[in-house]
């Protein structure tokens, strides 16, 4: 090689390195998390033929769907689900052991986002005394803030406080939730001292009253809702002021007895949430960050859960809600396309849990089901334990399908904890609807199927969970005889099989039917963003969903 060619080669290498050094790592402008509260996986397909092309169908056709995503723990509740999605962790690690839980060391009842050290901003009282303080690990939103030296903006929005606070994490710029007394969006002093002007402006518009004027009638002729039970039935709860749980509904009239709480249990609650999310994008410049870093908007749609609890999963109300939600999602995606740019954002849709059929409905179809009357069973359990040990009130609570012992009483009366647990287990095994009763001190050796054992251990936080875990038979849940509506909390597929759909920047379209987990969502987003996993993560990125 002569001198001239050597110089040319050296110069080429120099400029190649210079180009490489100047290359910028491409990332999406915005990540949007959509959690649809109480959305069973099968809702993606149950009403598929009635969905528009640009809502759920667009997510499925243009995005990646993990069709067999399961929840890794029991019990399956809202606060735990939101925490798990955003942390890739489970209650044993992240500390969120229920919507409410008991601090075992003190016996104190604790709401998942309760923080008495902060005050409401935009509202009054305990409704605003909320923060992520009780969450023990970082979220994917926290990790984004850390990765960008806190230059990214992170905002959480949900009608439910826990649905906005827990996903937004510890380092969020803001989390907003709805004050049911006023219909206003509020926050707490954990985030700020005063509401931004744009939030105050939105609240002044009294958007909820505008939605009430629309009423609630079915989107299509009611006789086309053939996938649902007849409108007037015994399985649904009425609103205050209603004689029957039937369409159409005059929301202005119902407001007189239900106030602004009413919006939570109507499809317009989802519309309200997404309208507020759009306003946040515009005013906070989410996805158009002047520092050119990725922002994160965590949205939870709470109304699907309120409606499901009140009317159950086979109702016309649920079918109509999802048909309307499909339109809302289509509108929101179109908004993102226009304002952030199609292909410039990454979005995922999932759920915090599913829901069971109403037990009476299921029994009327000749299925096995029933109600576990927690209040009556606790009373009976305490009476029988008192007869054996000579001490009253040994059981404090049966919350979260767990037996919480009254340790103050046990210690004061010098009763052996192990003996109380053994006696309680023996009694509970005789109760109708109980499949398994597990001593949490011996969970790893318990004689239950492995999949159940793993979920029980994952859901157990020894500082915040009960001493005994109850597993009920399928289609049994906590409630009184002939209870209306539905609930959730079990390990069964109707509660624990959830959607996990990814769309947009960094996502490879397609689907998989292999088993994945709720804990896989956060690390998947982390890998797309090329940032570190949350610090309590146990999940694995869904590689098939990621554009390499």
UniProtKB/Swiss-Prot annotation:
Gene Ontology CC entries for this record: external side of plasma membrane; membrane
What's the source species for this entry? Answer: Myroides odoratus (Flavobacterium odoratum)
Organismal lineage = Bacteria, Pseudomonadati, Bacteroidota, Flavobacteriia, Flavobacteriales
EC number(s) in its UniProt entry? 7.2.2.10
InterPro entries hit by this protein = Alkaline_phosphatase_core_sf, Alkaline_phosphatase_prok, Phosphodiest/P_Trfase
Identify this protein by name: Calcium-transporting ATPase
Residues recorded as binding substrate, renumbered to this chain, are 99, 160-162
Question: Which parts of the sequence bind a divalent metal cation 1?
Answer: 37, 78, 352-353
Please name the GO terms of the biological process aspect recorded for this protein, alphabetically: calcium ion transmembrane transport; calcium ion transport; cellular response to magnesium ion
